[in-house]
Amino acid sequence: MKRIEEVLNVDEVYTMVEEGVTKPLKVRLGNGEEAIVKYPNNNCGNQVLLNEFVCGCIAQEIDINVPPFGVCQLSDEIIETLPYEWGLDVENAGLCFFSKLITSSIPVTFGALSVVDDPSFNLARLIVFDHLICNRERHDGSSV
């Protein structure tokens, strides 16, 4: 997939995603697409936003299939409508990283990927990419 060049606005926030370390948001963007958004001043810091964007660009350059991604704007006005319990305030407004929500996707490990029967899939390229970006999420303990 590819990077979205335009900076999109977050038009609506549906929920906070509890599974993520950064507690990202599930949103509707100005283009009508649903996305997962990592916002500034999250509990992992702002470096996460840059890391996600750079990783997306690297994946795109070496033909790793990733969801469309880019930068979006989360406004003070949207933040102020969110539940107090989420712990977000205007410090979390600003430029964010987003990736389009792919509803049919599932997390996978290298063990599961090793049996993929698709000639267009390149496991070696994915392994190199994961090592390059220090991704440990696909490691299930049974791979090198």
Language model features by range: what are they?
Residues 2-110, 135-136:
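Conserved ATP-binding subdomain of kinase catalytic cores across diverse folds
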Residues 105, 110-144:
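Conserved kinase catalytic-core segment
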